[in-house]
């Protein structure tokens, strides 16, 4: 069966790569960024903004690496803030929560429950709309456990444990309420739970072959219950059904300008940025995903270099792109999460610029 999956995946890989190569010159999409759309109280500050989500009322949830506590290195850095649709601050959710360690992603489900993935504590938490914890996935390492070394990367990695994570990154749901969690930096798998929180299995392992992963960084589901996984280190998006069967592999092949600015660090070397498992800074490598509501759904994808957002059809055709790396409005510094409550309305969480942006697109 595994050989069949690999063969199927390789067939789709070749076809999707060819298709995306044909879309090498999609148009730039004009857009605006709403100035000062979030209004923070005088005594609150964002740290690196790792997550952003929008509920059915238009409320915006920002997950930031603010409220830092502890030593300079290894400090806890996670804070969840809610804003109204007008950008006015409403409340902090989960102040001093036991799970807070290193903020990674926030999502809102169809019932307006708020979900948070914390990479540092290896925990996913579900809050109800009132802000109370109603479900917990995974377990934070015990403070008294001398063997707890969550930042170690043994090679080969230790075997995954059912129901537990190692540097978890994101979560999504299907129409039946099953939960899919991208687990993430180390375990390199998708973990599945039923709607009551019971373990239902997993798929994936480290590697670059079809069905394998190198940093699952974001995960979303469309209305057909197809699961899109941002396989960041391999610079691709893998699409599965709810049982873990590989359906297709999507790649974004839109070349970056030779003079494209870099958000931070040295310019990615072409050879290193395209090597298997080392595609994190390759143009089009997926850092963040979101899918618009219907009736026609679109997939938005963000990369770190050259700092673009791409608009795709669900079968991987690139319709256009917007943005570039930088520090002023309409520029981006490592987009870490996207929310797209409408086709032409996109919310952006940025790590390097410590901010969120609300974008209004004006496609021609």
What are these regions (language model features)?
Residues 5-16:
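Bacterial N-terminal signal peptides
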